Amino acid sequence: MTSSIRRFVTSDTGVLFWMACGGALLHILLNGQYGFHRDELDIIMNARQLDWGYVAYPPLTPFIARLGLELFGSSLVGLRLFSALGQGVVMFLTGLMARDLGGNRPARVMAALAAYIAPVALTAGTLIQYMAFDYVWWVMIAFFTVRLLKTDDARYWLGIGVGIGLGMMTKFTLAFWVAGLVIAVLLTPARRYLRSPWLWTGAGLALLIYAPNLLWQIQHRFVSLEFLNAIHARDIAWGRTTSFWPEQLYVSTNPFTLPLWVAGLIWCLFSPSGKRFRALGLMFLATLALLALNRGRAYYVGPAYAMLLAAGAAWLEGWLESRAVWLRRIGRGLAWTLLIVGSIVGIVLIKPVAPINSSLWNTTSNVNGEVVEMVGWQDLVAQVADIYAKLPATDKPHTVILAGNYGEAGALDLYGAAYGLPRMISGANSLWERGYGDPEPETVIVVGFERGYADSFFRSCEYAGQVTNRYGVKNEETKFHTGLYVCRQPRQPWAEMWKTMRWFQ
């Protein structure tokens, strides 16, 4: 080992690097249980149909998933590798933010771990979906903003611009983070950067990166705005936004880190030593307020807390350094006890570690409803395959499978070929634009609809089974619209029916 490598390994930055590698590795080791989540199945399905945009989200996540498919096939752990690595990056950048905010090595390690154990971060490190990478870009923007404020080097606007461009190519809610940044710049001395060519170059860079999806939106009449409005109205109607404030304490952040990020926010806003970083506190509060006023989902704010955790850890270690030895020991002992307990609780409740139907599973699945949506997809496809196998041979050439939601569609797309299943169609999101095929279907296996809905489109519908899974786990597939039907004799030409068969999910 050369002296330069040895110095890096033992340096403060090296410690953060190895810690980030360890965090990513832990995700990789724990990501192999159960199966794909419904959201992952949708991403993988679109990864097999690459485009510069999709109804529900921008294209970057499907592009990353396509790389995973090329490298690892449909491996659960392989496809989730990129999400795990993303959380390693989040740990590393959070530690570096603590450094730039004045934190020593213990503060940097503390901040990195505190960011890692947030429930939304643990979920982001588990699933190959847009939230995983959106999280990275939020933290990346925060990191470059901290560097900008610390060094007064306007060239960091280029890094901010890259983060914004990549973020807008991943998830549209990044616009709230950008709005928070703009408000913070306008309300603080950072507005001096408005005269800097580097800021406008960064803005141009962001627009250049986002341009492919922007052009796609123009070509498709901004269908994603229509989708977002519909989904937002649905979320409000279903009460998904009513717990925005309490979920800041146990979804967006780990409750055991509450003292840390609160201290960080107070330090940024009010401490004389934090005056240079006032913009960070305002950036956070503006983003939080905008999302609350727009009745957004609580977890959208999650990555914004990383910079506050970094500030809180830096302040805590600085405060303890000036105290008596006994007080330092008590303070650090208490802080690390909270972090260790929070880590254990967070990992057990959020990561897919509990054996299905064990007593631990019963607890974790009640707390974290996402895990039940990782169970039963291959069983569903096998049931559909059994129905298809029983059809008369003369019907099979003109048979399609109509899927009610993107999870069912994604499962049929991923696993259907192994069973020799026919074409899958759906009116969900981007699938509607891919049409019903040619020639027109004559026999349709209907999955994920109530009988009455199927009857409204077909004169003949026969009950063919009910969705179950081998574990008896109750999830959306086994609780709602569980009937499987074989339908024939469309009531209208397919071209007319298809106009009314579009839905957003």
Go through the PLM ranges and name each one.
Residues 4-5, 9, 13-18, 94-117, ...:
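Transmembrane-helix signature of polytopic, membrane-embedded enzymes
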Residues 20, 111-119, 164, 168, ...:
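Short helix- or helix-capping micro-motifs
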Residues 81-102, 140, 144:
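Transmembrane-helix motifs of polytopic, lipid-linked glycan transferases
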Residues 99-102, 141-157, 266-272:
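Membrane-interface transmembrane helices that cradle and orient dolichyl/undecaprenyl
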Residues 120, 126-134:
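Short acidic/glycine- and proline-prone juxtamembrane loop motifs at membrane-interface regions
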Residues 144-165, 196, 200, 204, ...:
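Short hydrophobic alpha-helices at membrane interfaces in multi-pass membrane enzymes
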Residues 175-277, 347-352:
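Transmembrane-lumen/periplasm boundary regions of multi-pass, lipid-linked membrane glycan transferases
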Residues 328-397, 407-410, 414-420, 427-429, ...:
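Membrane-proximal, lumen/periplasm-facing interface regions of secretory-pathway glyco-
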